[in-house]
């Protein structure tokens, strides 16, 4: 994940996930598309600071994969001043079998954090099932004394959790995805 990475080719700042081969060859990047902003006119927030590049997929060890960043997947209605373009479905239509979902969600100890958690998790599972894709979401871990804003783990193409990390603190997990399943 490269937040505020300025690409040398165009000089623009992107919030991005970068893809490399196992040998370190750079394949390209996905930039956050549904950038957060206020619902005012004009909107204010990261929507004013980050550029967007076209949605694309990548070949990793012969598997078509894609990436989404945080709000790209769930299009939170409280901070998405543009239409929900259903990026999970678009990646599925482009042939993606696995989507890596990088999350840097806000969190707190309030009831509203519980509402956001439920919204994030249900969107994640429903969009994986609707697109028939595997989704690997990973949220940041700070502050470590609060539950993350969305579960981290692996959701299969039927929308079911097959691996899930503990919800507080820095965690590690691994899971072998069987695409023939």
What are the roles of these predicted feature ranges?
Residues 8-98, 102-103, 112, 116-119:
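Active-site catalytic loop in hydrolytic enzyme cores
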Residues 1-2, 74-172:
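CN hydrolase (nitrilase-like) catalytic-core segments centered on the catalytic cysteine
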Residues 30, 58, 138, 165, ...:
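Hydrophobic residues at beta-strand termini and immediately following loops
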